[in-house]
Structures are given as C-alpha cells and as structure tokens.
C-alpha cells in the first residue's frame, strides 16, 4: 500500500488595501513556493475598517483570476466569507493579512483592517498573522520575512494560541536587524480635524494625522521599529480588564 501524500499547505490571504494592492500580491508571489494561496480581499481600499461587518447589504464576490476573489465588503467580511463559505469544506492552515501599506503599531491595531482580518481568522479557529510594512517601498523585504515566519511555523508551530501582529521596517533585507518580540506602545490621541469646503460651498471634514508616539520606550513595537528590528506582538482578543474585577466588585458592594 502506498503512503498517502501529506496534504499541501493552504494559506488564505486578505488585507485592507484591496485585492490588487502591491503588498498582498507580493506576499502571494513569495508564498506560492510553499503553499496553495487563496486571496480573498476587499474590492477597494478599506483601511481603518477595523472589525466592521457588512450587515445591511449583500456581499458581492467576484473571482478576478484563479484563486483570487474580490469582495464588496470589509476585511472582516472577506475572512468571514472565506472560512464560512468559500473554504468551509477544506479550511486553510493559516490566515495571513497584509502586507499592509504602512505601520500598524501601538493602538493603531484597534482601527486596523489588516489586524481585523487576522483577528477574524483567529476568532474562527485558524492560526492568523497580520503583516505590515512601515512604509511603501520594500514589500519584497516584508514578503521574505513573512515567508521565514511561515517556514518556522511549519517546522515548529507557533507556541501560543494568539494572533500575531508583525511590523517590518521599510529597509532592504540586508539592513534589517533581528526580530524582537514586543508589546504594543501607544500614541497620543489624534485631535486635529481638517475643515474644507466642497465645490458647492458645504463644509466637509477630514480626520487628521495620527498622534505622535506617547509610549515608545524599550520593549515596545515603536522602539523596535525605530532601531531597525522586525516587531512581533502577540495579541489577545479578550478585552476584560482582569486586574479590575475585584475592585469593581468591591465598589458595587460599598454603601
């Protein structure tokens, strides 16, 4: 009797920059030497969509080429559709999101569609990783790092039931330092709104730029990137402030 061949690795890719973005296409090209790659991504840029789901209209899905699907929806919609419908009978081994065109550091992760896509994969039981390039030039560098992470996971699975947020400096590969495990830093709140007039004279507003780093000390993702290191931050989705449970219980019982 012949031995059964090992099942080939299967990877789902998504993002928030859109199905035709350079980051996701570069990542897919790099990973196709390792695995079957299926792209399910938004039909346009959905940066900042966070974990939003489309509930008031249908999701329109178009197969734009073999194993590449465009979805009129958010990054979370894309992964939800892929795992609960498109690939439900043969789930992927990994969900990867990115490569994002820009950083997802500190509390950026609360707004990030890139991180949200990975979070949805995590919710649905698949090991998930978000990749972001801190810039818009060296996507090949970021894709090479992503491939190394996947290869290491294949050799020895990631030892934690957490989704990973990985940021890569926008540098040539040979200029990168090592990889550091970090915690999330924090930014000052963005307070500036940009007020303009549209062609009809109506007031319109744009959100201002992100605030500057507030907590960027040693051990944070901000600090690692500034020093030229790749940053890996394990994330959890339980938002419970466990250290506050007893204090809240005491407060409620006080007369």
UniProtKB/Swiss-Prot annotation:
Subcellular location: Cytoplasm
Gene3D superfamilies according to UniProt: Survival protein SurE-like phosphatase/nucleotidase (3.40.1210.10)
GO cellular component labels: cytoplasm
E.C. code: 3.1.3.5
InterPro entries, alphabetized: SurE, SurE-like_Pase/nucleotidase, SurE-like_sf
Cofactor section: a divalent metal cation
Cofactor comment: Binds 1 divalent metal cation per subunit.
Keywords attached to this entry: Cytoplasm, Hydrolase, Metal-binding, Nucleotide-binding
Chief location category: cytoplasm
Protein's name in the database: 5'-nucleotidase SurE
Classification lineage: Bacteria, Pseudomonadati, Pseudomonadota, Gammaproteobacteria, Vibrionales
